[in-house]
């Protein structure tokens, strides 16, 4: 199925036109999330998918959603969907790097594409095809599940003035960025979202990155770690809908189309909701929390991060041809797309602030 062409060849109106009939199959699915039940806007994406498919199918295709407090395994989503315990999951692809390093780039890469660039790569630059090739090996499909946009660089107890300040720092930071921070001397840990504040409060970690002001402020990180750094590591963090391949392939075609369209709509809605949340929270943050010090890492730190990124990419590309193929595809697309990003967004913003 050509997932990247669903909206172009079918369209939501067409899906509505082929709604459920009395003879249609009744299907009840379950979806497991990495997130707790109140972690908006992440949890809103699966909820919207369930709502859309239920309405389009006249209640014959339903999806029950179980949050991490129900499954008791926030990072077990991959395996639960793979074995068919759940037909779907909502998580992030870079959490599965220990299972298959080729899954990692489909979330985001340090110093990589912006959100528009990455979505264009997925749907028109070959990204979806590459992603399905990787996940097919595991009996799964993966679909974009909502983007956070560029993330902030994290909350730190102390100011980072030089690369030496990273040595021995205990930090929660997932994905390829975690590999980079480990290489430059940090002790990197991956902690479930529901345990982040407690881990920071108890001193289990010295720093963490989460998302951006829209989600971070209500978590209370600023009460403990007031140094808030701008980002470099996750310029376009894409969550994912994981779908059991056998379950999806066994759906009636119209249900496949309903689900595929619902996921794409919900992913975009999550992106713009998160953007709104962060825009509103940024203004509130500067007014209500003057103790927060917004900083950018010094050039000396960026230099070592970029050097580590380059070395690690070469290392992983040498180990895994599939990983290399994905990275080369992303970099080639970004090289071309970035010319337009600079000409449009960058120069517009530069002109508007001068």
Place the predicted regions along the sequence by residue:
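Core domains of carbohydrate- and sulfate-ester-processing enzymes
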Residues: 123-127
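Short, low-complexity disordered leader/linker segments with a strong preference
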Residues: 1-28, 348-354
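N-terminal secretory/targeting leader peptides
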Residues: 23-118, 128-354
């Amino acid at each position: 199925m050509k997932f990247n062409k669903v909206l172009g060849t079918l369209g939501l109106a067409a899906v509505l036109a082929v709604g459920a009939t009395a003879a249609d199959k009744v299907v009840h699915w379950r979806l497991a999330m990495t997130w707790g039940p109140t972690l908006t806007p992440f949890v809103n994406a699966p909820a919207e998918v369930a709502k859309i498919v239920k309405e389009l199918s006249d209640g014959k295709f339903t999806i029950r959603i179980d949050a991490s407090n129900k499954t008791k395994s926030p990072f077990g989503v991959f395996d639960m969907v793979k074995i068919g315990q759940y037909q779907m999951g909502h998580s992030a692809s870079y959490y599965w790097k220990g299972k298959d390093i080729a899954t990692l780039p489909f979330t985001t890469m340090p110093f990589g594409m912006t959100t528009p660039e990455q979505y264009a790569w997925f749907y028109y630059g070959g990204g979806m095809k590459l992603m399905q090739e990787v996940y097919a090996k595991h009996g799964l499909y993966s679909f974009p599940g909502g983007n956070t946009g560029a993330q902030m660089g994290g909350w730190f107890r102390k100011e980072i003035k030089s690369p030496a300040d990273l040595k021995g720092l205990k930090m929660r930071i997932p994905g390829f960025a975690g590999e980079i921070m480990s290489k430059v001397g940090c002790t990197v840990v991956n902690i479930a979202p529901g345990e982040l504040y407690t881990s920071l409060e108890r001193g289990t970690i010295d720093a963490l990155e989460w998302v951006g002001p829209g989600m971070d402020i209500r978590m209370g990180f600023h009460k403990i770690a007031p140094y808030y750094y701008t980002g470099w590591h996750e310029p376009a963090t894409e969550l994912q809908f994981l779908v059991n391949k056998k379950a999806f392939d066994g759906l009636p075609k119209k249900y496949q189309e309903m689900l595929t369209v619902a996921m794409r709509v919900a992913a975009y809605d999550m992106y713009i909701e998160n953007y709104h949340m962060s825009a509103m929270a940024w203004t509130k943050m500067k007014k209500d929390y003057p103790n927060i010090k917004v900083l950018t890492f010094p050039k000396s730190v960026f230099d070592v991060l970029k050097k580590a990124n380059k070395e690690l990419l070469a290392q992983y590309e040498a180990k895994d041809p599939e990983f290399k193929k994905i990275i080369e595809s992303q970099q080639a697309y970004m090289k071309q797309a970035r010319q337009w990003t600079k000409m449009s967004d960058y120069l517009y913003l530069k002109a508007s602030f001068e």
